[in-house]
Each structure stands twice: as C-alpha cells, then as structure tokens.
C-alpha cells in the first residue's frame, strides 16, 4: 500500500513538472518560461527592422518573426533535409496567411550552419543590433523560436523548437 502511494505521488510530480512549460538553462541553473506574453510599442520595433534590417513591414498586419539563434545541439541534429525544411516553412507560411495575412520575417543571430538547410528559399536577415534577442529572449532559445506581434503591439514569444500548428493556434489567440 505504501509503495503504491509513493508511486502515485512520484507519478503526479512527474506529470506536474512535465506540464509546466519551462526551459532550464543548465549553465546558470535558471528556469525560464518557454512562452512570454506582453505588450510593446510596435511602431518602434517596425522602425528598427525597416531601417536597420532593411525589412519591409506593413504595420497594419501581424508580424511573425522566425528566429534562428545559431548552431546548437538541437538545431544541428535531426533528419530533416533541405527539401523537407522548405516544405515545412512553406506550409507554415500558408497556414499563417490563411489565419491572417501577416508579415513573416526570418531573423538570425549567428548564421553558422543556417544556410546548410535553409539556403535559397527564405530571406534570412541578421538581427539588427540584436534587438530581437534583447527584447524577446533572455537566454539562448534551443533550436530557435518565434515571436508573434499583433498590429497593436501585443506579443507572444516562444523560446524553443516549435510545431507550426502550435504557432497557428497562438496566432489565432493573439488576433482574436
């Protein structure tokens, strides 16, 4: 009976810890939320991206930023090919624009290994003055991440590898 009770307690702790969306930075032993929600001045961000990053943005549409932090253990492994990656990004963009026509911007911090899988089919821009990293990511996002920003400046940032369907759900949540 005691063994069953202890197993039940252990199992419930595992379920609770697995359902909490957090990311652990092993180097500093800090825990960061995988998602952050907030509000920012959209016109300032648009201005920085337009002027420093030479990125065309329609301020009346949501802004979707796909972020590549540089090579890490997560994004340098796996079995995706250039072709499968291209198909994945195209489906993601189609789904985004089906929900709401949007500005979709691809931004990188460090291009190491970026153009091995992504070259030739997306226009990746360097993070101008590290504004995306400093504003949205307090630590290195493993694999990458995304930021969804409404025309009014409400945002959701996601720190880590993501599924395009989850991104679509968050975009619907943001614009509704």
PLM features: residue spans?
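Thiol-/selenol-based redox modules, centered on thioredoxin-like
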Residues: 151-155, 160-176
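Generic short beta-strand
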Residues: 145-146
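Start-of-domain marker
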Residues: 19-61
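Solvent-exposed loop/turn segments at secondary-structure junctions
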Residues: 13, 70-73, 111-114, 154-155
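Structural microenvironment flanking redox-active thiols in thiol-disulfide oxidoreductases
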Residues: 75-115
């Amino acid at each position: 009976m005691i063994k069953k009770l202890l197993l039940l307690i252990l199992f419930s702790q595992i379920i609770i810890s697995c359902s909490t969306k957090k990311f652990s930075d092993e180097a500093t032993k800090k825990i960061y939320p995988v998602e952050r929600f907030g509000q920012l001045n959209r016109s300032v961000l648009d201005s920085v991206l337009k002027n420093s990053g030479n990125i065309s943005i329609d301020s009346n549409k949501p802004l979707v930023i796909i972020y590549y932090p540089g090579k890490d253990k997560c994004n340098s492994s796996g079995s995706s090919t250039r072709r499968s990656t291209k198909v994945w990004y195209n489906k993601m963009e189609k789904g985004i624009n089906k929900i709401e026509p949007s500005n979709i911007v691809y931004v990188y911090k460090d291009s190491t290994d970026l153009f091995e899988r992504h070259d030739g089919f997306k226009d990746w821009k360097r993070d101008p003055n590290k504004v995306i990293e400093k504003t949205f990511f307090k630590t290195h996002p493993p694999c990458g991440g995304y930021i969804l920003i409404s025309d009014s400046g409400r945002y959701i940032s996601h720190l880590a590898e993501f599924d395009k369907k989850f991104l679509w759900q968050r975009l619907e949540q943001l614009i509704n």
